[in-house]
């Protein structure tokens, strides 16, 4: 039986782009796009082998950001603008990991959606 070889396309991207970090209470997702919004690379804590409550830790966000940044760096991206959304832990660790992977962080913008007294929040947990 013939084996199917999966060929990954090599795309040269522009050296500037945007990093979108979504840090929820349960997971962290990092998406790196070019200036038009086309996805260059992405990563999440679950994709990197973290399960359950370990997905929303600063260490998981560091590993996740490094994985996405390394892939984008190999494709030619050098300068990024960072957009952070969500209340999760490890937001700062994700930015530090991007800088450590060789990407030049130009701006950091918090785009967390805040309600103007919209929906009623869930009740308090009693543990």
Curated annotation (Swiss-Prot):
Keyword list, A-Z: Ribonucleoprotein, Ribosomal protein, RNA-binding, rRNA-binding
GO molecular function, one term: structural constituent of ribosome
Assembly behavior: Part of the 30S ribosomal subunit. Interacts with proteins S7 and S18. Binds to IF-3.
GO CC annotation, single: ribosome
Lineage: Bacteria, Pseudomonadati, Chlorobiota, Chlorobiia, Chlorobiales
Sequence similarity: Belongs to the universal ribosomal protein uS11 family.
HAMAP family named in the record: Ribosomal_uS11
Listed name of the protein: Small ribosomal subunit protein uS11
InterPro entries: Ribosomal_uS11, Ribosomal_uS11_bac-type, Ribosomal_uS11_CS, Ribosomal_uS11_sf
One BP term from GO: translation
Presence of the UniProt keyword Nucleus in the record: no
Function: Located on the platform of the 30S subunit, it bridges several disparate RNA helices of the 16S rRNA. Forms part of the Shine-Dalgarno cleft in the 70S ribosome.
């Amino acid at each position: 039986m013939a084996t199917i070889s999966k060929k990954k396309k090599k795309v040269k991207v522009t050296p500037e782009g945007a990093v979108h970090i979504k840090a929820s209470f349960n997971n962290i997702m990092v998406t790196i796009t070019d200036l038009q919004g086309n996805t260059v690379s992405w990563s999440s804590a679950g994709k990197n082998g973290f399960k359950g409550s370990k997905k929303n830790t600063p260490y998981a966000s560091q590993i996740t950001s490094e994985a996405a940044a390394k892939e984008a760096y190999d494709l030619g991206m050098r300068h990024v603008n960072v957009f952070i959304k969500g209340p999760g832990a490890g937001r700062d660790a994700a930015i530090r990991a991007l800088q450590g992977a060789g990407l030049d962080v130009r701006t950091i913008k918090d785009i967390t959606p805040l309600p103007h007294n919209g929906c009623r929040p869930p009740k308090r947990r009693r543990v």
